[in-house]
Amino acid sequence: MNVKKFPEGFLWGVATASYQIEGSPLADGAGMSIWHTFSHTPGNVKNGDTGDVACDHYNRWKEDIEIIEKLGVKAYRFSISWPRILPEGTGRVNQKGLDFYNRIIDTLLEKGITPFVTIYHWDLPFALQLKGGWANREIADWFAEYSRVLFENFGDRVKNWITLNEPWVVAIVGHLYGVHAPGMRDIYVAFRAVHNLLRAHARAVKVFRETVKDGKIGIVFNNGYFEPASEKEEDIRAVRFMHQFNNYPLFLNPIYRGDYPELVLEFAREYLPENYKDDMSEIQEKIDFVGLNYYSGHLVKFDPDAPAKVSFVERDLPKTAMGWEIVPEGIYWILKKVKEEYNPPEVYITENGAAFDDVVSEDGRVHDQNRIDYLKAHIGQAWKAIQEGVPLKGYFVWSLLDNFEWAEGYSKRFGIVYVDYSTQKRIVKDSGYWYSNVVKNNGLED
């Protein structure tokens, strides 16, 4: 039997996000988030779904951590809800919010599970959106203040931190496409958000160095594997643009090299703040690791009539329930590419997974062989990247639980644990048992 063994100490994890699983968004003195107001506005989310209940993790957190323990998973990546901690975004700290996350952190540590905390996974306090949110330069100060509260309260026990989850999605899907909160469609606002996200990230890293002496901090990006529709120069250039704009370079180029990538500047210089370069020296704060999220690949071509002159070409490939093409070698490509381009000291796959139309069978189980196949193929490609020298230190499945999939509501299931939303019953899917075995063996059996 051929076993693909991972390095000793490799961290196998599962991931979630606050608004997607917690429910009870206003409980115990929490403030409103932009996802609360956005999802409560008719037409924004499929079927009118909201995160009011979600997986009720706010009340069932203990049961959910017991599932992680039972599966033998070694790390749990979760996010903290900014408005639970600072209901107005700044100023008054809500002790009951701190208490909730303290219970989670302490329980994880008791069970030998390493917490990876995401400081911001999209649920901005609505009070700050009223002041302009990510488009307001002051948000770097607000974010630094919020981060300091987290580091001072949790930094004694939490040693692995992520400043931002997928800042491209925050800026572009939230402020240009209008599909995510706050639901804006303004390219100038979107690129100001890109810039302010970088400034906020750097400020948080700076505060981290002052407050947590023995931890690591990084940032997480969404990535696609873009391939050209032909060998034509214009299609190859379209791929380069998509990589620089859509993937990690949009943010890592400023962090490592002090400017936005070349093709992004060509496209977006006029949308960025006039004197954006004045901020670049502070943006270049050193980070300890890069987190990459990867789900899918895309065939792209030059299209003179499309925004940014790029459009997607559909391929006859297997797809997930999201309609995303399954291209496992993309995870290998993105890992190799980040090493080649920026050579970060450590890399994590902070999300990888798939939505399928899962059903509970008559035997009470969820037989999601398609998800097992997806995970196995991607983990195998990640293993290959390690063999070729990529400093990959861990892998997190998205997600532990089926949950509120943003604008798709509850219609898309990503979990390795099934959630029956009418009863909140949890059922470990076949993929959950399979993944448990991968963790136990620290590798894949062919």
UniProtKB/Swiss-Prot annotation:
UniProt KW Transmembrane helix keyword: no
Keyword entries, A-Z: Carbohydrate metabolism, Cellulose degradation, Glycosidase, Hydrolase, Polysaccharide degradation
Alphabetical list of InterPro entries matching this protein: Glyco_hydro_1, Glyco_hydro_1_AS, Glyco_hydro_1_beta-glucosidase, Glyco_hydro_1_N_CS, Glycoside_hydrolase_SF
Catalytic activity: Hydrolysis of terminal, non-reducing beta-D-glucosyl residues with release of beta-D-glucose
The keyword Signal is assigned to this record: no
EC number: 3.2.1.21
Pathway where it operates: Glycan metabolism; cellulose degradation
Molecular function GO labels: beta-glucosidase activity
Gene Ontology biological-process annotations: cellulose catabolic process
Active-site residues per Swiss-Prot or TrEMBL entry: 166, 351
Superkingdom: Bacteria
PROSITE patterns cross-referenced by the UniProt entry: GLYCOSYL_HYDROL_F1_1, GLYCOSYL_HYDROL_F1_2
Family (UniProt): Belongs to the glycosyl hydrolase 1 family.
Protein name per Swiss-Prot or TrEMBL: Beta-glucosidase A
Encoding gene, per UniProt annotation: bglA
